[in-house]
Amino acid sequence: MSSKIKIDDLANPLLTEFQQATKDFGETLKLELTSEAIINEAFKNSGLQDFGDEDFISRLDVLMRSVSNDEGLAGIGKLGVFNDQVRYLENRLKFEKFKKKFPEYHQEIISQPIIIIGLPRSGTTHLLNLIASDSRLKSIPYWESLRPFQEKLIDLENEKDLRQEEAFKEYESFLQTMPLLKSMHDMHPNHIHEEIELQAMDFSTYLPEWLAHVPEWRDYYLSHDQVNHYQYLKDVLKAMQFIRGPKKWVLKSPQHLEQIPALIKTFPDATFAITYRDPLSVVLSTATMLSYGCLLYTSPSPRDPQISR
């Protein structure tokens, strides 16, 4: 039986030398938190220019304005948000390239998926990994969710598939900066992950709420119907299924709990597995994890009022 880990410096963080150096480095950065800067970076990194439907730009505008208004977000936190949005745009560009090369992917049928929904910290990840151990089912390892489209497949220059290697490098850095998060929610590249990273390619998820204090984004996201964005997710799943079977999916995301109508409309023949945990325990667990993340990503110290909200 593993021993309990007690974190006693959430109110007054005691950073390691590496954590402090990382945080100090973040404060030296001059980041432009705008849609234009993120789009230009994605163009430069990918060598691609076609986003397809560009309606996402207005959503990205709202998101980045909301992030910019977070006065408590440290430089390294801003860098994390910036890099994430660039990666989502690169993935979107590669998806558009994929669609042009393999238009027949759209004939794929997402049939009778198993979809796990439940509150954060209620065991959804454990249940997902348990069910996904059945080799008859298709699921998404974390490394693949980060970069779903192999560059060689869409005729880009990189002949070697480096996606897993990149994910492991990022994981090692993650363990150095936030070592205790492994005990809270281990983001090992090979663990089976939720589809939120795919949804983020269309810039309409609750994910930013985990990364920054973004009430403007939260209100904007919740005020808009999400069916089209869930259809976008389904389209990406069709592409991934076309690339590599099998054809019966197991999926999960706590976000689905607040989007059940859109989820059912998109996947009407799904089987839903709903986890339950005492909501008080959920709140305590979530607050602990967010507070620990704030040690590095907020400045000057954790922001208890925002976390409690």
List the predicted regions and their residue ranges.
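Extreme N-terminal, non-catalytic leader segments
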Residues: 69-111
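Post-Walker A helix-loop "phosphate-sensing" segment adjacent to the P-loop in P-loop NTPases
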Residues: 134-142
